[in-house]
C-alpha cells in the first residue's frame, strides 16, 4: 500500500528531492528491485489486445514471465544490473492490513459476478490480481536461467532492498511503495519497471535531501509515515498530510502527538485508534527483519541458453526466435559489465539550507511554469477572446 499522501508532501515542500531521469542515466548502476511489486504490475499490465492475461496452451498465466524477461532486458540494454528481492513472511503487525485486503477482494468478486459490460468485468478482474507462490517460484526459475541474482527476504522485500542499498551492494532500491524511504534507503527509484510505451520518466528520490528539506530526523519521518497511514497500523482519523506534517514539526514525536490529542487540547474531530500500535510499527521500520547486506553476495553470470529456451518456449509457449534474440541481448549486456561512472570519482556534498531552499524554489517555479503553459495552449490560428 505504501504511505498515503507522502508524494503530495514531497511535491509541495521538497521537490528538489526528486530527480526525473531517463533509464539511460542509470548506466553502470546496480539496483535492488521489489519483485512482488513488479510481478503485480506485470500481471495487471502485460495482456493481450482484448485485455486478457497471457497464458500458455495449458491455460497457465505467463504475463509475469514476459514482464520479467523483457523489462529486465530493457534494464540490461541500458547498463543496469538488476537484483530482484522477494517477500518473505509478512510481520504479524501486517495481518490487519491483509485482512482488509481480503475483505476488499470478496467485495470485488461479488461486483465481478454482477458486472455485465466487458469493460466493467476487466476492471474488477484487474483488482483481483494476486501474486501467488507459483508466480514467485516461476520468476525465480527464470532469473536463475537468465544468470541474474535474487534475494529471498526473511520478511518485507522493500526493507531488504533498502538494506542492500545502505550496505553499498546496490545503488538504490526500486519500488512503487513509498514506505521504502522509511527503511532508510539512500535512493528510491520509482517507475523503473514500467513499460517503455508509457514514456514515464524514472523518479529518483534522494532520502538525505528529503529529510534535510523537511527538517526532520529519520525517526520523525517514520512517525510522519505512520501518522499518514502505512501497512502496519491505521492512521489518526481526521489528520491529513498537511496537518500530519505540522503536528510532527510542532510536537516532534508520536508519543507527544497522542498525548496532545487525548488531552483535549486538539481538534475534537481527530481520533487516535484504540490500542494504536505505533511504537511497534516504528520499530519495524527502524529494525526490520533482513539479511545483513554484508552477508549477501550478488553475482551476475552467463545465461543458461538451452535451459532458458526449454522453459520459456517448450514449457510456457513463448516464441523461440524472440527468446533467443533476447538471450543475445542479455549476453551482450552482461559482458559489458558495470563500467565506472564519472560521478563515482567525486563525493557530492549535501546542500546547505540556502542552497536547498533555492533548489526547491526553482523546482516549484518550473512546475508552475509548465502548468501555466499547459493551460494556455489553444487551437492554432484562432485569436483569443
UniProtKB/Swiss-Prot annotation:
DNA binds at residues 47, 71, 156, 229, 231. Residues 376-385 have a biased composition (Basic residues). Keywords: DNA damage, DNA repair, DNA replication, Endonuclease, Exonuclease, Hydrolase, Magnesium, Metal-binding, Mitochondrion, Nuclease, Nucleus, Phosphoprotein. Mg(2+) 2 binds at residues 177, 179, 231. It is an enzyme of class 3 (hydrolase). GO terms for molecular function: 5'-3' exonuclease activity; 5'-flap endonuclease activity; DNA binding; magnesium ion binding. Its cofactor is Mg(2+). Residues 338-346 are annotated as: Interaction with PCNA. Binds 2 magnesium ions per subunit. They probably participate in the reaction catalyzed by the enzyme. May bind an additional third magnesium ion after substrate binding. It is found in: Nucleus, Nucleolus; Nucleus, Nucleoplasm; Mitochondrion. Residues 120-251 are annotated as: I-domain. The lineage of its organism: Eukaryota, Fungi, Dikarya, Ascomycota, Saccharomycotina. The gene is FEN1. It comes from the Eukaryota. This is Flap endonuclease 1. Disulfide bonds: none annotated. Interacts with PCNA. Three molecules of FEN1 bind to one PCNA trimer with each molecule binding to one PCNA monomer. PCNA stimulates the nuclease activity without altering cleavage specificity. Residues 1-105 are annotated as: N-domain. Coiled coil: none annotated. Structure-specific nuclease with 5'-flap endonuclease and 5'-3' exonuclease activities involved in DNA replication and repair. During DNA replication, cleaves the 5'-overhanging flap structure that is generated by displacement synthesis when DNA polymerase encounters the 5'-end of a downstream Okazaki fragment. It enters the flap from the 5'-end and then tracks to cleave the flap base, leaving a nick for ligation. Also involved in the long patch base excision repair (LP-BER) pathway, by cleaving within the apurinic/apyrimidinic (AP) site-terminated flap.
Amino acid at each position: 500500500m505504501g504511505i498515503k499522501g507522502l508524494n503530495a508532501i514531497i511535491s509541495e515542500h521538497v521537490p528538489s528531492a526528486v530527480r526525473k531521469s531517463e533509464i539511460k542515466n542509470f548506466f553502470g548502476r546496480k539496483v535492488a528491485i521489489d519483485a512482488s511489486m513488479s510481478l503485480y504490475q506485470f500481471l495487471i499490465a502485460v495482456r493481450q489486445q482484448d485485455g486478457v492475461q497471457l497464458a500458455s496452451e495449458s491455460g497457465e498465466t505467463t504475463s509475469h514471465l514476459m514482464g520479467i524477461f523483457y523489462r529486465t532486458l530493457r534494464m540490461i540494454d541500458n547498463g543496469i544490473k538488476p537484483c530482484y528481492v522477494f517477500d518473505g513472511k509478512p510481520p504479524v503487525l501486517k495481518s490487519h492490513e491483509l485482512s482488509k485486503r481480503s475483505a476488499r477482494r470478496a467485495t470485488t468478486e461479488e461486483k465481478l459476478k454482477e458486472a455485465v459490460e466487458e469493460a466493467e468485468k476487466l476492471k474488477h478482474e484487474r483488482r483481483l490480481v494476486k501474486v501467488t507462490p507459483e508466480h514467485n517460484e516461476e520468476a525465480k526459475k527464470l532469473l536463475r536461467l537468465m544468470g541474474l541474482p535474487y534475494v529471498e527476504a526473511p520478511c518485507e522485500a522493500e526493507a531488504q532492498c533498502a538494506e542492500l542499498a545502505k550496505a553499498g551492494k546496490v545503488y538504490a532500491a526500486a519500488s512503487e511503495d513509498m514506505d521504502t524511504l522509511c527503511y532508510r534507503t539512500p535512493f528510491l527509484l520509482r517507475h523503473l519497471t514500467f513499460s517503455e510505451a508509457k514514456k514515464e520518466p524514472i523518479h529518483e528520490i534522494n532520502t538525505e535531501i528529503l529529510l534535510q528539506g523537511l527538517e526532520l530526523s529519520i525517526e520523525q519521518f517514520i512517525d510522519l509515515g505512520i501518522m499518514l497511514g502505512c501497512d502496519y497500523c491505521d492512521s489518526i482519523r481526521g489528520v491529513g498530510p498537511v496537518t500530519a506534517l505540522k503536528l510532527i514539526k510542532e510536537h516532534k514525536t508520536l508519543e507527544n502527538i497522542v498525548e496532545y490529542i487525548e488531552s483535549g487540547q486538539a481538534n475534537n474531530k481527530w481520533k487516535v485508534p484504540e490500542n494504536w500500535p505505533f511504537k511497534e510499527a516504528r520499530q519495524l521500520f527502524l529494525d526490520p527483519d533482513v539479511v545483513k547486506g554484508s552477508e549477501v553476495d550478488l553475482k551476475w553470470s552467463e545465461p543458461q541458453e538451452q535451459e532458458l529456451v526449454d522453459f520459456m518456449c517448450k514449457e510456457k509457449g513463448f516464441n523461440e526466435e524472440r527468446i533467443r534474440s533476447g538471450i543475445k541481448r542479455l549476453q551482450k549486456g552482461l559482458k559489458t559489465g558495470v563500467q565506472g561512472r564519472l560521478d563515482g570519482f567525486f563525493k557530492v556534498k549535501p546542500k546547505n539550507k540556502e542552497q536547498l531552499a533555492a533548489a526547491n524554489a526553482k523546482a516549484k517555479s518550473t512546475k508552475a511554469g509548465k502548468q501555466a503553459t499547459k493551460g494556455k495552449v489553444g487551437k492554432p490560428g484562432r485569436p483569443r477572446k
